[in-house]
Amino acid sequence: MSGRGKGKAKGTKSKTRSSRAGLQFPVGRVHRFLKKGNYGSRVGAGAPVYLAAVLEYLTAEILELAGNAARDNKKSRIIPRHLQLAVRNDEELNKLLGGVTIAQGGVLPNIQAVLLPKKTAKASK
C-alpha cells in the first residue's frame, strides 16, 4: 500500500458531474448549496444530480412556453410579460408558482361577462 497506482493517466481530462449526467445545470454548485444550507448534516451523491435535473427541466418548460408567448406577440426576445403569460396560462405551472410575483409581468387579460355589451336583435340582422 504505497499509495501509488490506480491513478489517472496524465493525458486524461476531468469530466464534470454535469456532463456525466448529461445536464446543463451545475451539479457541483447545487451540491455546494445543499451542503451550505441547513437541509441535513450529510448530502448523498445522487441528490444534487436529481435536483439539478429537476431545475433544468422546469427551466426548459417555462422557457419553451415563454418563447411561444413571445412568438405569438411577434417578438424575438423573451420579456417578463411573456414569462407571466406562460406561467399563468399553464395549469400546473400556475399551481406551482401560485404565490410568486413576476416583476414587470402584468396581469392576464380578463373581462367579466356581465361587463361586455349585450347583443341585441338589431345587431344580428
From Swiss-Prot:
Residues 1-21 are annotated as: Disordered. It is found in: Nucleus; Chromosome. The modification Phosphoserine is found at residue 2. GO terms for cellular component: nucleosome; nucleus. It comes from the Eukaryota. Its main location: nucleus. Monoubiquitination of Lys-119 gives a specific tag for epigenetic transcriptional repression. This is Late histone H2A.1. It comes from Psammechinus miliaris.
